[in-house]
Every structure is written in C-alpha cells, then in structure tokens.
Curated annotation (Swiss-Prot):
Residue numbers spanned by region Disordered: 73-100, 120-286, 366-394
Cell location: Nucleus; Nucleus, Nucleoplasm
Gene coding for it: dhx16
Residues covered by the Helicase C-terminal domain: 665-838
Protein name, as recorded: Putative pre-mRNA-splicing factor ATP-dependent RNA helicase DHX16
Organism: Dictyostelium discoideum
Alphabetical list of CDD domains matching this protein: DEXHc_DHX16, SF2_C_RHA
Domain Helicase ATP-binding: 477-640
Amino acid sequence: MSSNNESIKNWVSDKIFDILGYRESTMVDYIIALSKKAKDVNSFISTLTEQDFPINSNTKSFAQELLNKSQQKIQNITSSSSSSSSTSLSSSSSSKDKEKEKIEFLKKNKSYKLVIDHDDDIVNSSGSSDSDSDSERKRKKKEKKKEKKDKKDKKDKKSSTRKKSDNNWDDEIEPEPIKPNEKEDENNNNENNDNNNDNNNLQKRQPYKSIIEEENNNDNNNNNGEEDEYEREQREVKELSDRIKKRDEKSTKKKIVDDSETKESIERKNRLEQNEQLETERTKSRRKYLVGEEQKRLILLKREIEEEYELFKDQKLTEQEIKDFEKKKKLYELASQRINESQQSDDYYQLPSEIKDKDSLLKSSYINDNKNKKGNDSSSSSSYNPEQKEWEQNRMKSAISENRGLSTANIGGGNEEYEYVFEDQIEFIKEEVLKQGQKGDGVMILKPGDDGSAQAKMTIQEVRKSLPVYPYREQLIDAVREYQVLIIVGETGSGKTTQIPQYLHEAGFSKTGKIGCTQPRRVAAMSVAARVAEEVGCKLGNEVGYSIRFEDCTSQKTVLQYMTDGMLVREFLTAPDLASYSVLIIDEAHERTLHTDILFGLLKDITRFRPDLKLLISSATMDAERFSDYFDGAPTFNIPGRKYEVTTHYTQAPEADYLDAAVVTVLQIHITEPLGDILVFLTGQEEVDQAAEMLQTRTRGLGTKIKELIITRIYSTLPTDLQAKIFEPTPPNARKVVLATNIAETSLTIDGIIYVIDPGFCKQKMFNPRTGMESLVITPVSRASANQRKGRAGRVAPGKCFRLFTAWAFDNELEENTIPEIQRTNLGNVVLLLKSMGINDLMNFDFMDPPPAQTLIAALEQLYALGALNDRGQLTKLGRKMAEFPVDPQLSKMIIASEKYKCSEEILTICAMLSVGNTIFYRPKDKAFAADAARKLFFHPQGDHLTLMNVFNQWRESGYAVQWCFENFIQHRSMKRAQDVRDQLELLLERVEIPLVSNVDDTDSIRKCIASGFFYNSAKLEKSGLFRTTKHNQSVQIHPSSCLFQSPPKWVVYHELVLTTKEFMRQIVEIQSSWLHEIAPHIYKEKDVNDNQKLPKNIGKKQINK
C-alpha cells in the first residue's frame, strides 16, 4: 500500500511539474485529496482551474488519469475485502438455510455492545426470556449441536480469514459469542449452566471493553493535552496583551496632563495661571513706562543742555566742566540718532519693476539732525554707515541711467516691462471653463503684495461663516439626528473636516461621548486639530486634541478628537464597542487606505448593535453610491463645490519627461502669469528633491530678471519644521512654489494656491502574490484623483490647472477611480492585525472591496511559516508580539528572533536603515567618482545589511554630525529618519519584554537572525550566473547598487524584489544553505538545501557582466 501511494505521489509530482513548471510536496497531497473528493472529471477539472492550472489538453488528460488511478485504488480495496468475506461465507456454509441462520445469529450477537454500560441489562434480559420459554431454548440447543462439528472444522479457516481482513472490529469479535455456547453444550445442558455461561460470556467480553475504555481514555488524555496546550497558549497571548496595554499607558507621551481630579491641583493650576498673567501684565506695563520715560528723559536732557549753554556761554569754564558738557551733548546726539533710525524705513535697493519714478528712487529717507547748524548733507551726517549709503545711491543711479538703454519714463509707467522668455516653453490648450459652485464671480487678478484672499483680514468666526458648509449647518445636524449612518460628499476645502465636528459639538452630540474624526495621515491629524483648537478658543489638548502613534495630545476634557485611522483600528483591541464615542467621522474615505477599508467592516458591525452611535463617512468625490450601498442604503448629504472657477489646460502633445516639463511650466507661470502660489504634484521624495534642485539651478543665474521664487517641499518623511514652511504666508512681490507628493491632494489645505501643475502620475504599491514581489510602481492617476488635484486651485481665487498630458489621454487612458490599497498590497500586516483583534474568519470578513483570495491565502501561509499562527489559524504568543511592531511581519520576526541570537542592538539598526529605503546615499553628477569611492568604504563582504549597519554606527561615532554626512555623500535627513525609527523600535522592544543586547562582532548570529525572518526570500546562484528563488522558482539578479554585485555568493536572502528593467534583489546578505533547514525545517528539507555541486570560479561575475 505504501509503495503504491508513493508511486502515485511521484506520478502526480511529475505531471504538476510538466504543467505548472514547479513541484511542491504539499501541493501534491492537496491535489490527490481533491481527486478523491471529485464526483466526475468535469468537476475535477474546474477545481484544478481554480488552483491556477491552465485549461488545456494536458490538464484534462491529467485529471482523467488521476481520477482513474484513484477509483482503481478504491475498487482494489473494496474488491479485496469483499473477496475475503465471500470466501469465508462460502466455506462456512454449504446451504442457503445455514447461511440465513448464521446471519440471524450474527445480528443477534451485534446487539451485544462492548462499550456501553448497560450491556449487563441486555444479557440478563436475554436470559430471562429463555427461562420463560423452555421449548424454544431446547430447540435452539439442538440446532446448535448440529452445527457443532462444522464450526469446529472451520474454526481455523475463520481465524485465518480474519487475519487477512482490514482489521474490522466486527470481524474480530464475531466468533467470541459462539465459544461459550459450544462449551455449554459439551459440559452441561441445564438452565443454571445457561445463566452461568452467560456470565462467563460477559467475563470473556470484559477484556475487550476494558481495552476500548483504555484506548478512549488515552485519546481523551491526548485531546485534553492538546486542549491544555492550546488554552495555555491563548492564556499567554492574553497575558501578554494585558502587559503591553499597561506599558502603553505608562510610556505613551501625554502632552496634556489633566490635573482636575483634586481640589489641590485646581488651586495650584489657578495660582500658576494668575502668576503668569501677573508677570505678563507687569512686563507690558514696564515696557510702556520705559518708552514714555525715555522721551521724558531725552526732553529733560535737551533742556538741561540748552540752559547750561545760555548760562555759561559767556563764562570761562574749567576743563572738567567742558568735558561734562560735551558728554551730555554726545549722549543726547546718540539717543536722538537711535530713535530716528528706529522710526525710519531702511533704504535698500528695489527692483526696477517696482520703481514709480526717478524722484522716488533717489529720495532719501534719513532724518536731519536738528542740532547740526553747519549745513552739512543730511544723509552724510545722520547715516550710520555713510560709505554703504553712498555706494547704494551710486548703484541706483547707474541702474536708471540713460546710458543703460532705459528711460525714466518707462520705468515709472510699468506698462512696458520686459519679460524673461524661455526657449523650451510648453504650449497648452485651454479647456472650457468649468463653473462649479457660485456663479457671477468675476476674474480676480492678484495685486502685488496681496496674499490671495481677504481671509487674512477676517476674524475666525467670519472665516468659518465664509466656508461652503456653513449655510447647510442646520440641515446637516437634522440629518445626523434622523439617520444613524450618513454619507457626506463635498470637495476638499468646503469645511467638512474642521467645521462638521464643531457643529455636532455645539448641537450637543458630545454630551454622551467624544466626537472622533479619523485622518489617513498623521500630518493632517495634527494640523487640523491645531486649527480647530484655535477656532474653538482652547488650548490644544483640552477640548480639542489629537492622537497619533507614540503621541497622545488629549485629556479627560477632550470632546473633539482627531486621530489617524490606524489609531482607531488599534482602539478595537482594547474597546471593541468604542463605548467612549458618540459620533465617528471617517474623513477622506475616498482615498481607500488599508486601515480605512478595515474600519468600514468593523464599524458596519458596531452600528448594528449600537443604535446610539452616529457614523459619518466623509468623501471628496462623487462616488458616494458605493458607500451608500455598502452601509445598507445610507442617505447622502451633498455640499456644494468650490467658490471659484478653475480653467484646465492640456498639452498639445504628450511630454516625454514629465519632471522636466513640470519645472519648465513652473518657470513659465512665474514669468508670464499674475502673482499666486504654485502647487506641483510629483510621485515621491526623490522627484521632489530633484525638481527643487533643478529649479534652484535654473533660477540661480537669472538674478533680477525674474521676481523672487520661494521653493518649498512637502512629503511624509520631511521633518516637521520644514513641513511648516509651506503654511507660511508668501512675502509681498514674491511667489511660492510647493513641490508635493499626493499628500497635498486631500489631506492638506494650503492657502494662496492659484496654479496647479499635474503631471498625471503617482506612485502606488503593487504586490504579486505568485512571485511575492512588492514594489512601488509609477502609474497614471485616475480621473477622480486628477479632479481632486484640480480642486486645489479654486479655493481663494479663480485658478488654473495645467495638466501635462493631452485631453484625449484624460478621457481614454485614465481609470475612473483608484484601485483600493487593500487589493494591491501585501496583506501580512492586515491579517496579523485582524487576528490580534480576534477576527479569524478572514475569507468571509465584510470588506467593501474584498482582497484577492490568493493574496489572502499567501499572507496566511507566510504568517504560519513565520510562527505567528498555529495549525488552527489562531494567533500565537509570537504572533501577538509581532503585531506590536509597525513593520512587515518578516522584519518583526527578525526583531523578535534577535533575543535568541543575542544581537538585538544590531538588528534594530538594520531594521531602521531598511525602513528608510534607498535614500541613504546620493550621487551628484559632478562628483560621481568621489561618491562611489566614499560608498565603497562602507562595504561589508557579507552583505548589504551589514553595510547599512556600518554606515549608522560610524555616523553615531561621529556624534551624528552633518559634516560627516556631507563628506561621505550621505543624506543627513534620511539618517535622522532612521534614528527616529530606531528609537521607536527600541521602545517597542521593551514593551514586548525583549532585552537590548549588543554583539557586533558575531556576524554569523546577525546573518542567522536576518535569515530567520527572511528565509522565504532565499535564492541560489546557478551556473548561468543568475539567481533562482527557492520558494517561487523565479530567476532574479543582484541589484547593481549592492556590495555583492561584483562577487555574488552561492546562497543569499534578500529584503525585497524590485521590478524595473529586470527582477532585481535589493539589500541582500550571504548565508549558508544549512541555515535554512536549521531555521525553518517545516519549509526546507535537508535534501532541498544540500549544496554539494560546485560552480566554476567567478562564473556569476562573467555572466552578469554580459
């Protein structure tokens, strides 16, 4: 039987390899099991196609042959058993009457049950029936005597037949009831012996019963052991969760501490506030007094000098009296000069375009000294630096002289100003004006020095009333009271995020619980909370607060709480019913982030058993029908669009280089268009930095030919102080350009934006579950996203949107909506998070857009291989620890394994550097050779992970110096980001009870620890010079930026696969093949990683160089 099963497995394995191109033992067993359950060939073929088998003749023939083999095997088994039973029946009786009698007798024997406790009753009842009918018993005894001889002769045959059978329990116990009856006929024929024999029968059957009970007890003990182990594991997971929760409460940074619990704290707080206020008032009063006192003292000094001069002008004074008089006079002159300089405006060189006339250009603003009676030039006598003043005046005279070819009349008129013209200007086609919102707004031209809106001069309440959502306040509140779930649709900037929570708070919804509002990004949550706190008139953290990871700016007074969607998801771990909230607003729902889609499913269940909870889904797009259908036909509340019209301009032909086209368009707008800030959408940090460098290079040599252009940037990893620069008001006679990723598409609102440049691309994360390849791919945006970008221009004035693609491409090549993130990303983190929340049936979880089943299965398989899930699909203690780290499951497994290999310090450094990505080194074009040489100094012969560790350790030894980064061509901003990530991971390491240990010299332990998390991502070098992955059997190559590119090792593990021109492994480290079996014996067998074959020397390098 075993040899037959083995041959079938080998045959199925060969066929699968011929059809699919790879083989796997678990797959073979699975296909064989499917064949046994299949009803016919067609159903079996359809099942195979669901497992990604191609529909062709090979698959159909394979299915037919496998079904034939399975059915033939079953028929052989049944035929063997039936033949043995027929042989025993034919030999046991020669007549049909005897056969019928035996069948009846066997049926009677089967009524004796060996396991049940009431067997004694059955035997006794049978004995009593015999005593009631003597004749019947005697007749049966005579019949049994006749069968006595035949049964003795056939006794051996029956026993041999029973040995050949398939260990059927009925076959083993069939002859036992006959033996005591035979003994009864030979020894005794009276009734008493019948009862005794019945008792003997029970005594002889008792061993079978005890054996069964013993086996059942053993099974129960084994089951109880498994249950105990499972319960123990679940108890450990729960205890770990409780400990983590307690540590969270202690370690979470509380920016606002609520001291209102005791009277003493209230009194102390009031005293401190009174003291601070008193000190502030004292300072103001002192300053005001000093200003007035200064004037009085100066007047008194002047009078004193005049009086002394009148009294002593005709008298001869001593030398000391003359010195005192000169000292007072000098003191008065200095004090007067300082006051005059503080009151006058600085005299500085102005651009010719701003000069009104020649007289104003040459006009001096210096104040003459009244004490100077000698008729000297005022500017020369009162100037603090007369040489600089003279030089500036000479320069201004030469700038307007007629010898330079400019007349003073032209300068003052401003009608004939010259424009700087670029050679590579882009021609745009203007689309029809799309009027959305208010009509009749005339075209507004921004004047020099205007900030783009009148909101700067308006009070906060006036600004609130000017927003589009304000006229619909009462209708919105009535709709929230009437419906439990409400879909709100309004364009970005209409006031949904800042005003709706305040309206609900003012209407009394916060009396029964907090009003929560989620944001997809932490930057948005912090900035919006600060704005709302300013509008409410409270300190941030009191009535209005925010909550992001590692930072909690809330208190017990907080009634309006802004948070990231990930924080609300994590609140389900501790409070599944969200009892502290009365209203929840899911903002920017149209972005369909990973956590937003999870919240949809969780909140949909909560609203069904919490009728008091109000749920508002806020979206900036018109795709509200899908949200309404998902939430059981929830009504939709529409808010009108933007206040000003936006014109759209398309290019006449497609642009080959959209980044260069965006830079040219910025300069073109800056030269030819009226004042107003520019917003440029780019795909990522690299493009933002590159565009900023290109703009600085092209404007550096223009000088006064163009007006001032302020270049700012915004992306998620940018430091907070640099992010805040985009919100600073633009100085007069200048223009600000904001280079942004899609973070500025909906999450941030920047005032003063008049022009939007949309290249039509964005960077999306894509995941292929078949190859396990996840990469960021630059893809065209959707039409909904393009309209979102366009809407950023119509907030404060009529705007323009310049799209760097054709109108035909917008209508025919762009998708209608963006693919949800949950359908194009690795679900390892999602599955781990849902499992930690106790949601086990992931296949039937109510997603709005369910992820591909193959992606979900791949995530479950990966988590099981990593040890995060047990064989029941439940979360293990290791998995509960892994869920605490905001990184990929493979990285979190590597961090937890560092406790075993005693290298947690080094692993934290490596994880932090890997999280930064590929922005560590930079390579200027003019210093490429020096940059490459500096980078090679950090190379480690065993892999890129250790190279990154060297970079961080040397930077730390230099005292985190900026100059060290500059000298080694390393981006200091990326290193600071890695340092922040490492600090966060170190705090989490303490939460999951893992000590911090350093072992920098033991590189084998570090590489083993890396392999313990990334054993799935292993690859072996082949004779062709290419690598082949062991899991997916895919040909890949080492990325040219790797330190092992020139001398590839035989076995490596890689951090990620990147699909560019080829499939590249990025961030690799050398391992030994035996480690794979040692770390993951459930995945790699010893024969799979047996490495006896030797490769020719440098074969990999030769093939790669080809």
